[in-house]
């Protein structure tokens, strides 16, 4: 260091003698900087170059240390979130839902997708391990709805998120009220709850919307009216709609009757024809209390498309109202009163213009039908058994009513339900 200072001093003297004062100062500063730099590097060079590698590592050390520190912090955060999540699962199993929600929230705040990173074979203690063993044995959750609701609460996200990037506005930006109104349109006035169940398969948010109690309550009121004011003995309105006996609206009840009758005897007397007669009965119910009934030899492929609306153009069509009745023996019955479609008769003034018009007694004819609602096989409420059928003729002039009751024999075959997809393909009004 002393030799360097002497050299710098000698150079400065020479520069003062031969050069300008400004250049002399610059040279002095450069020499002093070089001297200090060499003095700092001298200890490293004295060890034979072996310490050059640690110096290079120290030069790039801060970046590596920062990345290593971040990795350790992430691992520690994930371990903490894992412990909180498993503790929340244990609290939920014990019935402490509020404590479980608190731990779930803390775990989600640390690592949002901690649920998918947990190895359920690992547990911090023995109690949690026992709980996870029980959970693995029972893979299906008892209450999927509450589980989805908790997940959406922890994540504090929207009901749904787009699966792929789209430029158009996604349905997830709609508020809850608008989404619920759309769901009511899906159910529609035809009570297409099957479409609602299919819609719930889209995502967790749609599943929660499809289980909204208000939708199922409105559906129950549409079916049973004032008879379903109380939800007891069912736990939810959805359970009532699915398990309580009711008629179905998304199809037709059909029965087929076949019998043999004699024909006319041939001229020679040696042969008598026999005819096999087939005819169908169709019964279509509507949520507003209307019912249609048709008896015809035409097959279902021809008749069923005409039964989509109540304005079917068929002469033999009977229209009326129905109601459900549940007796003390828990047998659900359907009673209906149906009449012929009212059509305007052409004026017969010209026909009897020059003659005395005959006195025709005006009458009203209606049919009273009683059916018992049953289930067959794996399908619910898909069978109607005849219990009553009568014809009521009322004479308008006297007000008297003549009742003719028909015997319920083997000609009254049970009616079975057939679902028709086209009946619920279009929604006309919301629920």
UniProtKB/Swiss-Prot annotation:
One of its GO terms (biological process) is protein ubiquitination. InterPro entries: F-box-like_dom_sf (IPR036047), F-box_dom (IPR001810), Hrt3/FBXO9_C (IPR045464), MIT_dom_sf (IPR036181). Pathway: Protein modification; protein ubiquitination. Pfam families: F-box-like, FBO_C. It is found in: Cytoplasm. Part of the SCF (SKP1-CUL1-F-box) E3 ubiquitin-protein ligase complex SCF(fbxo9). Substrate recognition component of a SCF (SKP1-CUL1-F-box protein) E3 ubiquitin-protein ligase complex which mediates the ubiquitination and subsequent proteasomal degradation of target proteins and acts as a regulator of mTOR signaling. This is F-box only protein 9. It comes from Xenopus tropicalis (Western clawed frog).
């Amino acid at each position: 260091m002393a030799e360097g200072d002497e050299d710098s001093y000698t150079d400065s003297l020479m520069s003062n003698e031969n050069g300008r004062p400004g250049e002399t100062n610059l040279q002095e500063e450069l020499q002093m900087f070089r001297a200090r730099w060499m003095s700092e590097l001298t200890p490293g060079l004295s060890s034979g170059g072996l310490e050059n590698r640690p110096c290079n590592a120290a030069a790039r050390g801060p970046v590596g240390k920062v990345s290593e520190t971040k990795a350790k912090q992430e691992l520690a955060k994930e371990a903490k979130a894992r412990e909180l999540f498993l503790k929340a699962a244990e609290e939920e199993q014990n019935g402490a839902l509020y404590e479980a929600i608190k731990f779930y929230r803390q775990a989600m705040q640390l690592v949002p997708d901690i649920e998918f990173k947990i190895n359920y074979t690992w547990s911090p203690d023995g109690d949690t391990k026992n709980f996870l063993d029980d959970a693995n044995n029972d893979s299906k959750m008892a209450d999927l709805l509450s589980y989805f609701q908790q997940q959406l609460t922890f994540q504090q996200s929207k009901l749904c998120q787009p699966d792929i990037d789209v430029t158009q506005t996604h349905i997830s930006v709609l508020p809850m009220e608008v989404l619920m109104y759309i769901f009511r349109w899906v159910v529609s006035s035809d009570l297409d709850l099957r479409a609602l169940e299919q819609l719930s398969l889209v995502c967790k948010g749609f599943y929660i919307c499809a289980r909204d109690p208000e939708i199922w309550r409105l559906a129950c009121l549409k079916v049973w009216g004032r008879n379903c004011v109380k939800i007891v003995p069912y736990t939810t309105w959805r359970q009532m709609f699915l398990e309580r006996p009711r008629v179905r609206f998304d199809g037709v009840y059909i029965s087929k009757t076949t019998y043999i009758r004699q024909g006319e005897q041939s001229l020679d007397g040696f042969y008598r024809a026999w005819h096999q007669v087939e005819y169908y009965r169709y019964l279509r119910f509507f949520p507003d209390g209307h019912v249609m009934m048709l008896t015809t030899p035409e097959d279902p492929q021809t008749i069923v498309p005409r039964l989509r609306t109540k304005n079917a153009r068929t002469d033999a069509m009977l229209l009326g109202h129905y109601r459900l009745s549940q007796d003390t023996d828990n047998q659900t019955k359907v009673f209906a009163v149906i009449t012929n479609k009212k059509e305007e008769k052409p004026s017969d003034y010209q026909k009897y213009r020059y003659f005395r018009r005959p006195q025709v007694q005006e009458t009203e004819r209606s049919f009273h039908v009683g059916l018992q609602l049953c289930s067959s096989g794996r399908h619910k409420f898909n069978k109607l058994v005849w219990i009553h059928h009568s014809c009521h003729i009322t004479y308008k002039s006297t007000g008297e009513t003549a009742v003719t009751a028909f015997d319920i024999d083997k000609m009254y075959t049970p009616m079975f339900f057939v679902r028709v997809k086209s009946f619920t393909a279009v929604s006309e009004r919301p629920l």
